[in-house]
A protein has these predicted regions:
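Exposed boundary/loop context
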Residues: 2-3, 17
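Compositionally biased linear targeting/interaction segments
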Residues: 3, 25-336
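Glycine-centered recognition micro-motifs in short, flexible terminal segments and loops
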Residues: 9, 14-32
């Protein structure tokens, strides 16, 4: 059996040797550096991927926006074509006159698409032309949407009070005394509506009534502040508005809508053969004259329509090649 040298300490701790300590520290440092580099590379990779996705989304959004703008300009050109061809004669196939009753039209631009709807504002209920006499149309519209009779009276009277110049409220209306009693008080405008958003401040009107809920449409698309008439255009009014006009039955509404589809280049005339025995009643609320103010909803999309871009504009056509925007929302919440 060999003996250990006397100069060798049996209790010597190899882990405390300088050489071993330096090697261990170096190994730990290397591991830390590798870990930090791995985290940095992963973070850079994730950041780069996120930025790439953001750039692609931005690119797609801009392309969709330009497609929607193209649709808007196409709609304006169609309005010019309509104005320069008042008899609405179809010159040849593919050059049909665009109708202004909200029906959709589509177009392609490269690998993208746009869809547009044009509505003549004279086919809607004009809030700035509302009176105690014709307010019944708005009341009927509300009741057809499920609003109770007394609640509909409150809304119609409150809209009239919001516009009139005095501070005396109607039987079911509201003036300053009501609005000043609210938790956040304000005053009745006592002037014409400048935007439809003002309706949210009028007594009785809620988001559910204006915008709809649970599959039930709201009344906002049936209202306007831009029409020059206090009457409703039979040729462009949506079905919901037609059904709200006193004297017009469901049968007459269907007849009008069918005529529009079968003969889009002709107008529904204010004659008894069309409107039945209640012509005199109906005539107090309707017209067959087209206005020069139109709302346009345009959407653009490539591939996935869910990522579409929407624009809503109200345009006044002032001549053969002249127009101006009365309203322009980009993007909008359009459902075109």
């Amino acid at each position: 059996m060999k003996c250990l040298p006397e100069n060798l300490d049996r209790n010597h701790d190899f882990q405390k040797s300088p050489r071993f300590s330096e090697t261990g520290i170096a190994l730990i440092l290397v591991l830390w550096v590798v870990t930090i580099l791995a985290v940095a590379v992963l973070s850079f990779s994730l950041t780069t991927r996120s930025e790439a996705r953001a750039m692609l989304a931005y690119k797609e959004g801009m392309e969709n926006k330009f497609l929607a703008e193209a649709g808007l300009r196409r709609a304006i050109l169609e309005l010019f074509y309509r104005k320069t061809n008042p008899q609405q004669q179809v010159l040849r196939e593919g050059f049909e006159i665009f109708q202004c009753d909200g029906r959709p039209y589509t177009g392609e631009l490269g690998d993208g698409r746009y869809r547009i709807r044009i509505e003549d504002e004279s086919g809607k209920i004009n809030l700035n032309g509302l009176t105690d006499a014709n307010g019944v149309v708005l009341k009927n519209l509300l009741m057809n949407r499920g609003v109770a009779d007394d609640e509909a009276n409150v809304i119609v009277d409150s809209i009239l009070d919001w516009r009139d110049r005095d501070n005396i409220h109607r039987l079911s209306g509201a003036e300053d005394d009501y609005y000043q009693s609210l938790p956040r008080p304000y005053r009745a405008k006592n002037a014409d509506f400048e935007t439809l958003d003002e309706l949210f401040r009028v007594r009785g009107l809620t988001a559910e009534i204006l915008l709809g809920t649970g599959g039930q449409k709201g009344i906002l698309p049936c209202l306007t502040i831009y029409s020059k008439s206090d009457k409703i255009n039979l040729n462009t009014a949506p079905p919901e508005v037609l059904k709200a006009i006193p004297g017009i039955s469901g049968e007459i509404v269907e007849r009008i809508l069918q005529y529009r589809d079968l003969k889009p280049d002709e107008k529904v005339q204010l004659i008894s053969g069309w409107l039945g025995p209640d012509l005199n009643v109906i005539a107090a609320y309707v017209t067959d004259a087209e206005s020069n103010v139109y709302s346009i909803d345009a959407i653009g999309y490539k591939g996935n329509e869910k990522r579409r871009y929407a624009i809503r504009a109200v345009v006044m056509v002032e001549g053969a090649q002249k127009y101006r925007f009365l309203s322009h929302k980009s993007p909008s919440l359009s459902e075109s």
